[in-house]
Amino acid sequence: MMRIGIIARFDVAEAVEIAERVASFLLNRGVEITVDLKLTEELPQLREYGEDIRNMDADMILTIGGDGTILRTRSLIEDKEIPILGINMGTVGFLTEVDPENVFSALEAVLRGEYAVEKRTLLSVYHNDELPSALNEVVLMTRRPAKMLHIEISVDDEVVEELRADGIIIATPSGSTAYSMSAGGPIVDPRVEAFLIVPICPFKLSARPLVVSNKSVIRVKLLRKGKKAIAVIDGQYEEEINHMDEVIFRKSERKAHFVRLSKDFYRKVREKLIEGGIDSIKG
């Protein structure tokens, strides 16, 4: 019997409502469910199914929210590699797979086994010890607004750039459509075995984004004394970086797993980022 986890933004009424309807739909079809314990505070009728996300044991997890909900969920179940099916309640939701109006037809397809599991590259991060891995990106930025960092970037022990900038983004192909894109980085097909190095507002005309092999080891060193920085991993975790500290990035041995009902990456680029996505968002 299939077991499906349900996680939703409990601060968004529509997401909570969809979670309730999804739970009822699955139970009526004989599917076992487990529900985020915090979500059951909004849906007390599902309390018997409540479980901490970290302890969830499921064949698949449904997230009802945006990309942030997916990133948070993935960080909490990192060691389990449970496939995630994202239902989009956010603005763009590039990591999500299903819009709210198609939720139940998508679930019918899932129950018929008409889906694939896509594996996405993760970025391992080290600062003294191993930090949580990143699905999208790691952002190194100053702790103080309007202050620049002085950083050295090395790839496979070769210095490729030294610059002053507001920060630096180390991104995966999955993250190429997120903060990296906003900072001027390219969109990269998730099948490409690469990492992106994207400066944020560099004080150097020649500084440009770099695309490097994901077999490479990237090192970023903070050079200027007295300028502390923070490393932000997928917007979920922060680590303080001090003068002459080095942050190391390499491809993780683990993967993130996503439920996919279609494989058209470029259709998603058109729909979410051009035709009906970012370019059409107002105010």
Curated annotation (Swiss-Prot):
GO molecular function: ATP binding; metal ion binding; NAD+ kinase activity
GO biological process, one term: NADP biosynthetic process
Enzyme Commission number, as recorded: 2.7.1.23
Residues annotated for NAD(+) binding in this entry: 67-68, 72, 136-137, 147, 164, 166, 177-182, 236
Active-site residues per Swiss-Prot or TrEMBL entry: D67 (proton acceptor)
Cofactor: a divalent metal cation
Keyword hit for Cytoplasm: yes
Superkingdom, natural source: Archaea
Protein keywords: ATP-binding, Cytoplasm, Kinase, NAD, NADP, Nucleotide-binding, Transferase
Catalysis: reaction(s): NAD(+) + ATP = ADP + NADP(+) + H(+)
Role, per record: Involved in the regulation of the intracellular balance of NAD and NADP, and is a key enzyme in the biosynthesis of NADP. Catalyzes specifically the phosphorylation on 2'-hydroxyl of the adenosine moiety of NAD to yield NADP.
UniProt family annotation: Belongs to the NAD kinase family.
Name by which UniProt lists this protein: NAD kinase
Native species: Methanothermobacter thermautotrophicus (strain ATCC 29096 / DSM 1053 / JCM 10044 / NBRC 100330 / Delta H)
